[in-house]
A protein has these predicted regions:
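N-terminal secretory signal peptides
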Residues: 1-2
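N-terminal export signals
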Residues: 5-25
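N-terminal active-site segment of His-dependent metallophosphoesterases
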Residues: 24-91, 144, 192
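Active-site glycine-centered loops adjacent to acidic/histidine catalytic or metal-binding residues
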Residues: 39, 79-80, 116-117, 207, ...
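Short acidic, glycine/proline-rich loop/turn micro-motifs
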Residues: 45-49, 86-87, 168-173, 214-216
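Conserved acidic residues
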Residues: 73-75, 202, 239
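Extended active-site neighborhood of metal-dependent phosphoesterases/phosphodiesterases
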Residues: 87-201, 227-238, 248, 252-291, ...
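Short acidic, glycine-rich surface-loop motifs adjacent to enzyme active sites
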Residues: 197-213
Length: 304
């Protein structure tokens, strides 16, 4: 569903909030249900290191078909929606983005995006947002991809770690993929958002990983993740952090917070391989993840 159509049909129960320009969504006791897909990496190029770039389009279309058959409040993709060709041509990469975004928008409901590092490999954040049509467009802080919204009585917070150490945006490959940062202003914004969430159960979405305390490679983790995690742990209503970036997937937990890294849909040849999930979160804090393809099922009966 396009943003303009969604705003005409708010009866679905999801309402955007950060600038408080719209009424707030109220939960009705039923669980929040949403679809998750990450690391699509669509491009029209040859397979490399088990990444089947072109086949990612069919994988995503099949995932969207499954999402449409379920009763979902929204779908969120956790970054690296597109990739680029061997030449790194920006115009070509934008064509890839247009094609894969069209498939994602086949979902008949709200669609949200998270910025990944490959989304800025040869284009800018501004160009990425100009070629996507998610519900987040009116909520963005300039071109930075951090925003929040409410759905079914839950606060959902999306972070953007596509920044260099000096606070500059990732843009046209001016970065190294192992150096992802959350700038000070975004950490302050996160703290304010969590304060304003008050008693609302809260979910956090980000592309690069935050669970620095785990045994995952530090190359995959946001460099100042300890600062972000410290903020999350000060707010007891944070239930989970949902991440991408690490294509095999991963799980860890600390201080009552689940850190779930979903496997990348790009890995392996279609139709033998795919990976996406439907997540169900109950008001009491229990979480059920129904995985498809190479994505495992998970069930958490409350905070970690």
């Amino acid at each position: 569903m396009r943003r303009r159509d969604f705003l005409k049909s708010l009866a679905g129960g999801l309402v955007l909030i950060p600038a408080l320009r719209m009424p707030l969504a109220c939960g009705n006791g039923r669980p929040l249900r949403f679809g998750v897909v990450t690391d699509v990496h669509f491009a029209r190029r040859e397979m490399a290191i088990n990444r089947y770039y072109t086949e990612a389009l069919d994988k995503l279309r099949a995932a969207v078909e499954q999402f449409n058959a379920a009763r979902l409040d929204f779908v969120i993709e956790l970054g690296d929606l597109k990739d680029m060709g061997p030449s790194g041509d920006p115009a070509e990469s934008l064509r890839f983005l247009d094609e894969i975004e069209s498939a994602l928008q086949g979902f008949r409901g709200p669609v949200w995006h998270v910025l990944g590092n490959h989304d800025c490999d040869c284009i800018s954040k501004a160009e990425f947002w100009a070629h996507t049509d998610g519900c987040e467009k009116e909520l963005l802080h300039h071109v930075a991809g951090c925003y929040s919204f409410r759905a079914q009585g839950f606060r959902c917070i999306v972070l953007d770690a596509d920044f260099n150490a000096d606070g500059t945006d990732y843009e046209r490959g001016n970065f190294h993929w192992t150096s992802a940062w959350l700038p000070d202003w975004e950490l302050e914004w996160l703290d304010r958002e969590l304060d304003s969430a008050a008693g609302e159960p809260t979910l956090v979405f980000v592309h690069q990983m935050l669970d620095h305390f785990s045994d995952v490679s530090s190359q995959l983790v946001v460099r100042n993740a300890p600062d972000a995690v410290a903020i999350l742990e000060r707010h007891p209503k944070v239930l989970a952090v949902f991440q991408g970036h690490h294509h095999p997937g991963f799980y860890s937990a600390r201080a009552g917070i689940h850190y779930v890294t979903f496997p990348g849909i790009i890995e392996g040849s279609w139709p033998a391989h795919t990976a996406y999930a439907i997540v169900e979160v109950h008001p009491g804090g229990s979480i059920r993840i129904e995985g498809f393809g190479d994505c495992p099922d998970r069930e958490f009966r409350g905070k970690a």
